[in-house]
Curated annotation (Swiss-Prot):
Top-level EC class: oxidoreductase
Residues at which Zn(2+) binds: 41, 62-63, 167
Cofactor binding remark: Binds 1 zinc ion per subunit.
Organism from which the protein derives: Cupriavidus necator (strain ATCC 17699 / DSM 428 / KCTC 22496 / NCIMB 10442 / H16 / Stanier 337) (Ralstonia eutropha)
Protein name, per record: Alcohol dehydrogenase
Known EC number: 1.1.1.1, 1.1.1.4, 1.2.1.3
Induction per the UniProt record: By limited oxygen supply.
Catalysed transformations (reactions): a primary alcohol + NAD(+) = an aldehyde + NADH + H(+); a secondary alcohol + NAD(+) = a ketone + NADH + H(+); (R,R)-butane-2,3-diol + NAD(+) = (R)-acetoin + NADH + H(+); an aldehyde + NAD(+) + H2O = a carboxylate + NADH + 2 H(+)
SUPFAM superfamilies on file: GroES-like, NAD(P)-binding Rossmann-fold domains
Keywords on record: Metal-binding, NAD, Oxidoreductase, Zinc
Length: 366
């Protein structure tokens, strides 16, 4: 008799539901992980709304914290019963992209029957959980290429302390790294959702001494101060570009980090840059972007625009866990709610509609 599990599956645009599915069978290079905590991401909401196409019946979610239930015959150095995380991006490190230093793009492109952009192709990169294979909002998940992607959780750290590592922390910190921040820099971070808050914390770790956090939610701006912001601006109460330019004496910021994914925030991120400044783009854009020439000076202002997808792999996860374990960053304030997997539909409703001050929801299968 086939062993079954509960999983949150994509049914159709606007509908994710809890269903019974077989517990995955693993191959020699895989691991079966029993999920103890996972969460819902903004990208999952894009899937729910039909803005990003996935197969019907696919288990969604890509942020796993759990316990190794079973190891493939070729996986060494781990043990059953060990607490682990895996990155949202699970590269196998065999592709040209990975060997060329961009492991998050491992996997390149797969045809999607014209359902999305990229000239009829679906950009998958190394994002497999909840995209190309069943994801983590379930009782169990198959972790592919486990040798390259499983990272042990140190004793003394809770699930909630490491829950941001697989995606939100990795993405936000990459935004700070890609901003080319130098010691003493001034940085503007546009949007203080979970990724933007992590970018704010990352900018502080990278050496920025003046961090300007921008959002339209005062509660999130309060949390941004805890993450390291020196100045907070509510865009509902001011002209953000004018305020940033005043704060910098008309010079502009050394770097800006765009963490929302809208035309407006992208433009503002450009307009506040000093000549030669760097825009680090993290937002998930749902439509084409227009780059306004008026946001540039001659020679396009010598500006640099860097983009990034969430880095994955066990070494990246190990480094992020080191930061958490050191106490230099505490992301506990980002976990605002907890739901059982049985109540995943209600959790999606809360998260998608951004009620009750929600930032991240810890989803517990048991």
């Amino acid at each position: 008799m086939t062993a079954m599990m509960k999983a949150a599956v994509f049914v159709e645009p606007g509908r994710i539901e809890l269903a019974d599915k077989p517990i995955p069978d693993i191959g020699p290079n895989d691991a079966l992980v029993r999920i103890t905590t996972t969460t819902i991401c903004g990208t999952d909401v894009h899937i729910l709304k039909g803005e990003y196409p996935v197969a019907k019946g696919l288990t969604v979610g890509h942020e796993p914290v759990g316990i190794i239930e079973k190891l493939g015959s070729a996986v060494t150095g781990y043990r059953e019963g060990q607490r682990v995380i895996a990155g949202a991006i699970c590269p196998n490190f065999n592709s040209y992209a990975a060997q060329d230093g961009v492991a998050s793009q491992d996997g390149s492109y797969l045809m999607a029957s014209g359902q999305c952009g990229c000239h009829g192709y679906k950009a998958t990169a190394g994002w497999r959980f909840g995209n190309m294979i069943d994801g983590t909002q379930a009782e169990y998940v198959l972790v592919p290429d486990a040798q390259a992607n499983l990272t042990p959780i140190p004793d003394g750290l809770t699930d909630e302390q490491v829950l941001m590592c697989p995606d939100i922390m990795s993405t936000g910190f990459k935004g700070a790294e890609n901003a080319n921040i130098r010691i003493g820099d001034t940085v503007a971070v546009f949007a203080q959702g979970p990724i933007g808050l992590c970018a704010t914390a990352g900018a502080r770790l990278c050496g920025a001494t003046t961090i300007i956090a921008i959002d339209g939610n005062d509660h999130r701006l309060e949390i941004a101060r805890k993450m390291g912001a020196d100045v907070v601006l509510n865009f509902r109460n001011c002209d953000v570009v004018d305020e940033v330019m005043k704060l910098t004496g008309g010079r502009g910021v050394d770097a800006s980090i765009e963490a929302l994914g809208t035309q407006a925030t992208f433009e503002q991120s450009l307009r506040v840059l000093k000549p030669g400044g760097t825009l680090s783009s993290l937002g998930v854009y749902s439509s084409d972007l227009t780059i306004p020439l008026s946001a540039f000076a001659a020679g396009l202002g010598d500006h640099k625009i860097n983009t990034a997808l969430c880095p994955g792999g066990k070494e990246r996860m190990r480094r992020l866990i080191n930061v958490i374990e050191s106490g230099r960053v505490d992301l506990g304030a980002l976990v605002t709610h907890q739901y059982r997997l049985d109540d995943i539909v209600a959790a999606y409703d809360l998260f998608a509609n951004q009620r009750d001050g929600v930032l991240k929801i810890a989803i517990k299968p048991h």
